[in-house]
């Protein structure tokens, strides 16, 4: 899904952090797949904007093109490959100087992408969103501080069920050539900048990531990692900020939302308020 109306959510663009202040890098995004993947695209666009990049909806105007891919089913994989090849044409015969491939297809075919599509300059997996800055040729901007004291929560890496299944090899990716051995564990929070690509009145909030159930028919745990929840206060803080920005419809999403909070040890009554 190409980026539509872009709205900075949470933090201003810091132009001084751009290593090329005379002409900001123009970055174009193509986001494929589910709303959860769209949130990942919004996070990467937020990080790029904070670093001084200029986002564009026109691939022909972009210096850097990012394709955030899906590989849940075979048809999604093919759509991702076709889109990468389409965007590669803007590099070989157009203005673009860099082509970055991100998302689930990278987790499954990391080495094969770079081997078979030499136009690809960098890949960014689902657990590596913050690497989008170096992948796009930008230096990271200083992270904003949120002024919070230490969190009243202890966050476990995953649910005990997920840890037990991992110990049994149920999440193994050893058979995937080029796959990173460790499962993705990235999880954005309310301090992470986002650029909304949804209509102005609505937004998604990803409250959790990953899944602990390695069903035979599903590849999500290998692509997204074990289940992990965001802190309750973090979700509320993001919702409040979105509301202040004019959002009136918020959809909470995750691979397994019914398990939200199972991996959090609460030491406050915030969830009951």
Predicted regions and their residues:
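Residue-level marker of positions within ordered structural domains that often coincide
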Residues: 137, 272-273
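Proteins enriched for Cys/Gly/acidic motifs involved in redox and nucleic-acid/cofactor modification
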Residues: 1-261
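Conserved small/polar residues in nucleotide/adenosyl-binding loops
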Residues: 266-271
């Amino acid at each position: 899904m190409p980026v539509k109306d872009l709205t900075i959510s949470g933090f201003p663009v810091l132009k001084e952090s751009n290593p090329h202040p005379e002409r900001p890098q123009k970055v174009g995004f193509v986001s494929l797949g589910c709303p959860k993947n769209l949130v990942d695209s919004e996070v990467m666009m937020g990080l790029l904007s904070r670093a001084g990049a200029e986002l564009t909806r026109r691939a022909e105007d972009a210096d850097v093109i990012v394709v955030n891919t899906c590989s849940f089913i075979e048809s999604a994989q093919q759509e991702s490959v076709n889109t990468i090849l389409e965007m590669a044409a803007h590099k070989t015969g157009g203005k673009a100087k860099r082509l970055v491939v991100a998302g689930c297809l990278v987790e499954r075919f990391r080495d094969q992408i770079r081997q078979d599509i030499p136009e690809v300059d960098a890949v960014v997996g689902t657990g590596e969103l913050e690497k989008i800055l170096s992948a796009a040729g930008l230096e990271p901007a200083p992270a904003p501080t949120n002024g919070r004291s230490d969190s009243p929560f202890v966050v476990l890496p995953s649910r005990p069920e997920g840890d037990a299944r991992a110990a049994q090899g149920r999440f193994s990716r050893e058979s995937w050539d080029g796959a990173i051995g460790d499962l993705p564990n990235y999880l954005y929070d309310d301090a992470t900048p986002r650029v909304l690509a949804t209509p102005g009145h609505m937004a998604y909030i990803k409250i959790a990531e990953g899944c602990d159930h390695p069903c035979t028919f599903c590849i999500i745990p290998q692509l997204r990692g074990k289940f992990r929840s965001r802190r309750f206060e973090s979700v509320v803080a993001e919702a409040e900020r979105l509301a202040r920005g004019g959002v009136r419809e918020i959809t909470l999403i995750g691979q397994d939302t019914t398990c939200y909070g199972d991996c959090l040890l609460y030491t406050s009554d915030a969830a009951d308020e």
